[in-house]
Structures are given as structure tokens and as C-alpha cells.
Amino acid sequence: MMSNMTGSEPLAAQARQLVQAGEWQQAADVLRQLIGEVTGVAAGQLTINRDQYSLNSLNGTVTLDDGRALFFKYHNEEGEDKTIEEYYNAELLRESGFRVDVPVYACGEPGRQILMYTLRHDRRMADICRDIEQQQAWDQEAEIEEAQRRADRDILTHTLPTLKPGLVSAVAAEPVHQLFYHRLISPENPEITAGLGGRVARFYVGKTFRLEDEELEWQTLSNLRWVINGVTYQHSLRQLFTEAGIRLAPAALAGHGVITAHGDAHNANVWYDTSEEIPQLVSFDPAFAGRNIPALLAEIKATFHNIFAHPLWLYEPSRCGELYKVTVMRRGDTLYVDHNWQLTPLRAAFLRDKGEEYWQPLLAQLARRGWLPPHWQRIFRLAMFCCPTLVLDLRAGGFSGHTQTSSALGLAMAMMLGSEPVEDTDEFSDWLAGISPAEQPL
């Protein structure tokens, strides 16, 4: 495997490729070299976590020869070495009062980006939530829900003082767009329509989709209308991707207010800190943090990944068949999908609290300042739509281990988030209506 890599290839990229090839020990050796170079201290025992939540990154633990134990995490995003100058931004979050774990080492060189923290023995919030759901330990839910609610309230408290008008140049420079717009475009191929490039081209365009008993080509599937659990939706997949390529462009978002934010603070990037009498949520790995993040994007990743990605279907697709019954049938230009997915009590509470404690007051403040556009729900929906479709290849047999069941469910979930019902309603539409400022048209 090593013979296929050039000596000039960045160490972080080498480690990522080795892990993908199942060469865990060689990957650990490469990371040990990188960590030794960054810290100036030889790295000893190193363990890479086999982690279902780290979809575009690696993390693990390492013991340095001076006895210190560290937790490391790094991203290996396509194109990041060309676009990110300041990759880690924990200090700017701490300066604004956010609870954030500050790394003891940070390297921002292209292809060598890595964060190292003092090793904690706290658990990640994502793991605690998964255990509650897997064990159906609903008696533990109240404490975790309250911690999340406090965190949502605290995030808003520190966010609102940073709200300001946006400048196109400053907004466009923010790394958060790597999670959305940059995954929709192919700058090297300008003839590709925005929204159908980037990961969309890599994952979906021209590919075959196996959705339970149906097998459809992209050209067909992308133009179908969807009826999900009896609810007819307005858009096709192609329409959602191309609209996202317009509405999520940095210049299109710059006029709607910007804030200081983490940008990717879903619960796999959050510690459940029990060092104080009252448990607190502490974020880490602020790879996409900034001072000019569009206000309508800042908590989208947390809203999707903490709530709609569970249980199992996104992060553990091979287990999807244990929980879900999904049927798919095409009739003419319409795809009918029925499934039994629903929010667990824990995720339903998270959705309610995120709306009440964060989104509702933020949207109201944007409306008062005249920065909330009439089409804000389209921006919100399209960003939510991009979370599952762009973080992983949702095709069965694609790059991410998805099955015919999880693929059908995942695309139906994305459609429900991205498109309004034609006549009926659904849980997400009701939630959006509930957080809407009264003076704003839907």
C-alpha cells in the first residue's frame, strides 16, 4: 500500500488512505511520525478510534514520550489545503465566551492539519445519546436533555452579541462553506451547474441507485416527485441540489447577518463534561469556526446530526434493517416511499429545545434587524438537505456502506427536510412554522 503513495504526499492524507485500505498499523505509524514532528516530542503508543461518527476525519489517543496523554483529531477534506489558512479557531470561540476545549497543539499546514488536546476521560455527548437509545434507558433522558437545553441556551447567549452585518468577502472566506457550498461545486469544471458538482457529481450524478426493490438511474431518479408516508413533496432531487447551489452560495448568504460560531458543533464534537456539579457540554475540534458565519448556517449541522440522523440509519447503515421497514415503488414520474422511522423521545426533545432556546430567538432578532429574508425557510431547508446527502454517499454500494434500506430511508429523509409538502404537513414543517417570527411570511 505504501508503495502507491508518493513521498511528498502529506502524512495526514497518507494515514486516511491507509485506514480506508484497512492498514491500521501503518496508519498509526504515519500518525506517530506526524505527531512527533508537530509536538517536538516522540510519540509512543497510539490508538486510532474506529468511530462511526467521524465521517471525514480520524481521531484517537497517543502517549508522548514525556508521559503526556493526548486526544488527536484531524480532517482530511478534499480541497482543504487550498482554502483554509486558519484551520483551528478555538481561541476565537473562547474569546466570545463559548465553552470550547482548546488544543494544546494545533498544526494548520496544508495536508498536516491536526489538533491535539489533553486527553479527557469524559464521554462524547453522541455516545451517551446512542447508549440511551440502544438500551432504551429513557430514565436517563431527562438529565441529558437538560444538559443539551442549557447548551442551546448558552450558545444563543454568546451568539447574539456577535451578530452583525456581513461583508461578501469576509463571508466567502469562512471555512464553514466547505460543509455546504464547496461540496456542491466543481471549480475546475465551470461548465458543471452549481449544485451538481463536487460531491454530488462524485456520489450521485450518472450513478445507479438501489432503493429496496427499485433500481433507478440518476437521470430518472433525480427528476421524480416524491410521496413519503402519503405526503406529496414539491421538489425533485435535481431541483433541490441546483437550488442549493444558488441559495447556499456565500454571496447569497452574506446579507442575512453573520455571527461568531463553531459551525460544526454536533454532538460527536461535544464532550459531556462532569467536572463541575452541573454537567456541561464542551465543544471541540472547531475546524469550521469563524467570526463571519452566516447566521442561518451556524447551527444547521448540529440541528441535523443531533436529531434527524438517528437512530442508526446514517452512522450505522448496516443495522438499518434491524429497526426499519421501508418500501419503495415507482409509478410513472413519482416515487412512493413508506417507512416507520420516527424521532425517539430524546431526539424529539432535542428538536423542541433547539427551536425554543436557539432558533426562535435568533430568527426573531434577524427579523427585527431586517436581515431575515422572505425565503429564509428555503435556505434553512436546503442546508438541512445537504447534511445527509453531502456528508456521505447515500447510495447502496457507494463509498459509505449504505444499504438498499438505509439509502431509501436517507434520501426520503433528505427530501422531507429539503422540500415543502404540496398540501399536507409533516413534523419538520410543523416545527419550522413554530419557530417562524410572526411578521415573516412563510
Task: For each feature predicted by the language model, list its residue ranges.
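ATP-binding glycine-rich phosphate-binding loop
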Residues: E23, G36-D65
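ATP-binding glycine-rich loop module of kinase domains
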Residues: N56-I84
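A conserved alpha-helical element in kinase catalytic cores
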Residues: K73-R112, D139-A151
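Active-site activation/catalytic loop segments of kinase-like enzymes and analogous catalytic loops
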Residues: L93, L281, A289, I293-L366, ...
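Short pocket-lining segment of the protein kinase catalytic domain that shapes the ATP-binding cleft
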Residues: L115-R123
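ATP-dependent phospho-/nucleotidyl transfer catalytic cores
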Residues: I128-H262, D273-P279
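Conserved catalytic-loop position in the HRD/HxD motif
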Residues: D264, N269
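ATP/Mg2+ or Mg2+-diphosphate-binding catalytic cores
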Residues: T344-L442
